[in-house]
Amino acid sequence: MDKLFLEIVTPEGEIFANDVKSVQVPGCEGEFGILPRHATLVTTLNAGVIEVINLDGTKDMIAIDDGGCIKVAEDKTTILANGAVYIGGSNESEIAISLQKAKELVKSMSSNTIVYATTIAKIDEQVRQK
């Protein structure tokens, strides 16, 4: 099975590090997807939601603020973000807390109202699916 190692890091530490099937990120020129053996690239990221498809088919989401960057190599992708919040948890209380933190992060860092509205809609959709 093809897999890609994804690492998401902030100044506070590592947010995510695992082998995944694919990842979709909010690039500076629009959203794009990354699969194993992707062409090498380095680019900046907008505020938004990173969607991760794990090896077992489950989906994780991480909200990031503006100004991050991504380095994609054939078998490893590294995302550096000023701020990031994992959206999820093992119970409704944890999910509600992470949802609120994600919304606050995106609201405080994005001056673009379209990016903000789109990101909040994606976050809300993920919570409804859990």
Curated annotation (Swiss-Prot):
Main location: membrane
Keywords: ATP synthesis, Cell inner membrane, Cell membrane, CF(1), Hydrogen ion transport, Ion transport, Membrane, Transport
Keyword field contains Transport: yes
Keyword Transmembrane appears in the UniProt entry: no
GO molecular function, one term: ATP binding
GO CC terms of this entry: plasma membrane; proton-transporting ATP synthase complex
CDD domains for this protein: F1-ATPase_delta
Domain of life: Bacteria
Signal peptide: none
Annotated compartments: Cell inner membrane
Topological type in the membrane: Peripheral membrane protein
UniProt function note: Produces ATP from ADP in the presence of a proton gradient across the membrane.
Assembly and oligomerization: F-type ATPases have 2 components, CF(1) - the catalytic core - and CF(0) - the membrane proton channel. CF(1) has five subunits: alpha(3), beta(3), gamma(1), delta(1), epsilon(1). CF(0) has three main subunits: a, b and c.
Family as reported in the entry's similarity comment: Belongs to the ATPase epsilon chain family.
HAMAP family reported for this sequence: ATP_synth_epsil_bac
Identification of the protein by name: ATP synthase epsilon chain
Lineage of producing organism: Bacteria, Pseudomonadati, Campylobacterota, Epsilonproteobacteria, Campylobacterales
